[in-house]
Regions:
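Residues that mediate protein self-association or partner binding, especially
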Residues: 45, 49, 119-127, 142
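C-terminal helix/juxtamembrane-tail motif
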Residues: 147, 151-171
Length: 171
């Protein structure tokens, strides 16, 4: 279910690793003896141990992207602290048809990817991107991914940013 024809392969591989807790999060690096326990705090500065569950679902900074995305696409939240359950609930949250589930799958994969790349940006470049800019990145990349695989997708940035479901004919 993480494999999606409109999502770059590297993002699907990343999600596959994420859902199996195989990313090099600080908690995994501590477990493998790569870094000391003292170096395991979340890069956002929230004070919690950086695990995949924390980073993507509980961190006060990173997890906030999900609510911004839900507001953008216009549906209610997902209530779980387990990544695999979050993925399934997010994709099936509208109870809609295959097209809406495919779109939500693409958005979930993209959000996770944006969060991970931002985590790496904070960790290795000591740079913080404001959350509204991360949402803009989700909007921009999702439009680009859809246009790259579908030449007949003619909607522009303004239409997409305003109402993506209407652009896809599912809203």
């Amino acid at each position: 279910m993480i494999w999606h024809r409109q999502v770059p392969l590297k993002v699907s591989v990343f999600a596959w690793r994420l859902l199996r807790d195989r990313l090099p999060t600080k908690s995994n690096l501590i477990y493998r003896g790569v870094i000391p326990t003292e170096a395991g705090l979340c890069v956002s500065g929230c004070g919690a141990l950086e695990s995949a569950q924390h980073l993507f679902l509980s961190c006060s900074y990173f997890a906030s992207l999900w609510s911004l995305v839900r507001d953008w696409i216009g549906f209610v939240g997902v209530d779980t602290n387990v990544l695999s359950d979050h993925f399934v609930q997010f994709v099936h949250s509208t109870g809609g048809n295959k097209a809406s589930q495919s779109f939500l799958q693409l958005i979930w994969l993209l959000c996770a990817w944006v969060l991970w790349t931002e985590r790496n940006n904070m960790c290795f470049n000591d740079s913080i991107t404001p959350l509204p800019r991360l949402l803009d990145k989700v909007k921009y990349l999702s439009l680009g991914w859809l246009k790259a695989r579908n030449a007949s997708f003619l909607f522009g940035t303004f239409s997409w940013w305003s109402n993506p479901l209407q652009c896809l004919g599912i809203g």
